[in-house]
Structure formats: structure tokens, C-alpha cells
UniProtKB/Swiss-Prot annotation:
It catalyses: Endonucleolytic cleavage of RNA, removing 21 and 42 nucleotides, respectively, from the 5'- and 3'-termini of a 5S-rRNA precursor. Mg(2+) 1 binds at residues 9, 57. It comes from Mesoplasma florum (strain ATCC 33453 / NBRC 100688 / NCTC 11704 / L1). It is an enzyme of class 3 (hydrolase). The gene is rnmV. InterPro entries: RNase_M5 (IPR004466), RNase_M5_C (IPR025156), TOPRIM_dom (IPR006171). This is Ribonuclease M5. Its EC number is 3.1.26.8. The keyword Calcium does not apply. GO terms for molecular function: metal ion binding; ribonuclease M5 activity; rRNA binding. Binds two Mg(2+) per subunit. GO terms for cellular component: cytoplasm. PANTHER family: RIBONUCLEASE M5. Keywords: Cytoplasm, Endonuclease, Hydrolase, Magnesium, Metal-binding, Nuclease, Ribosome biogenesis, RNA-binding, rRNA processing, rRNA-binding. It is found in: Cytoplasm.
Length: 175
């Protein structure tokens, strides 16, 4: 994972990834929602020479951190996702550190590129094709290991960031 920096929420996430991939893996810890302008500017500086991979927890704060970073950067951002189902059932936390090694490897092998400049579908297309309906949102969310609780507005934004076209989304729903 040369020239890659994985953005995680905390120390235990970094430790888990380094246990799997070795101590040479480079992570950047946001310290949860404590991500501030200084950290965002550091990430922006790192993005000039490195591939940025966001790998946050599959919960509300993780989603917020991911959106904050994507909105701040002007480059393609790579995203790794684990789902809540990938978390150890005996854990009280819903974090990356509690995910299985297999789920982490799968997530990092299946990165999704986001770019905030992408506009691949319009709101009219989104509504006309019933992508906003909860049942369809759940199918789409599960396909990408996103939260099933994601709002219609957020999903619309994220689908654009992924540069998905109507036919791509229809294919996902039809699977």
C-alpha cells in the first residue's frame, strides 16, 4: 500500500490495520468527530502526493467524518466500507477495530472512488426511478456496505460522488 494513507477514526483502528498489514502501513487518525481545520488541512496536504483512503466506522459519526473529508478535498477520494454485520457480535462498539480481518481486507480490496464534483444523475432521475423509496435505498446501501438508515438526500449525494448513472443503479436494484 505504497503512497496510500488510510484515514481512520482512532488509535485502535490504526492498530487493527497495522496488525493485518504490518507496521509500515500509514494511517491518519481523526480522533473521531474531533476532526478540525488543522487535521483537514493536513489531509489535504497529504492528498497532493498520496492516495487518500477513508476507512471510518459504519456508524453516524463515521459517515459524518467521511462526508467532511470528501467535501473538503478537491481530489478523488477512495473509500473502504465495512458493514455493521462485519462487527464482532460480542462487541459493544460498532467500529473498524471490531471488524473481522476478512471484512477489512475485502473492504480495502474493493475501494469506491468518490469525487464531490461528480454529477451523474439529477434529482428528477433519482425520484422518477424510485431510488428514493426506502426498500430501494436499503438495496443500494447494502450493495456498497453503507448504512441502511442513510437518508434519501444523502444517498443521492453519495451516488453522484460515486459517478453512478441511472443504469448502474437499476442494475444494483435488479440483482
Amino acid at each position: 500500500m505504497a503512497n496510500e494513507i488510510i484515514i481512520v477514526e482512532g488509535k485502535s483502528d490504526s492498530q487493527k490495520l497495522k496488525k493485518i498489514y504490518g507496521e509500515n502501513l500509514i494511517t491518519f487518525e481523526t480522533n473521531g468527530l474531533g476532526i478540525d481545520d488543522k487535521k483537514l488541512n493536513s489531509i489535504k496536504e497529504l492528498s497532493k502526493k498520496n492516495k487518500i483512503i477513508i476507512f471510518t466506522d459504519p456508524d453516524g459519526p463515521g459517515k459524518k467524518i467521511r462526508e467532511t473529508i470528501i467535501e473538503f478535498l478537491d481530489v478523488d477520494v477512495f473509500n473502504a466500507f465495512v458493514s455493521k454485520q462485519d462487527i464482532d457480535k460480542n462487541s459493544k462498539k460498532i467500529g473498524l477495530a471490531e471488524a473481522s480481518e476478512e471484512a477489512i481486507k475485502k473492504a480495502l480490496d474493493n475501494l469506491i472512488t468518490y469525487n464531490k464534483k461528480n454529477i451523474s444523475i439529477s434529482w428528477d432521475e433519482y425520484v422518477k426511478n424510485d431510488f428514493y423509496i426506502k426498500a430501494n435505498r436499503i438495496i443500494i446501501a447494502n450493495h456498497f456496505n453503507l448504512s441502511e438508515d442513510m437518508s434519501s438526500k444523502s444517498l443521492f449525494k453519495w451516488l453522484n460522488w460515486m459517478n453512478l448513472k441511472v443504469k448502474d443503479i437499476e442494475k444494483i436494484i435488479g440483482e
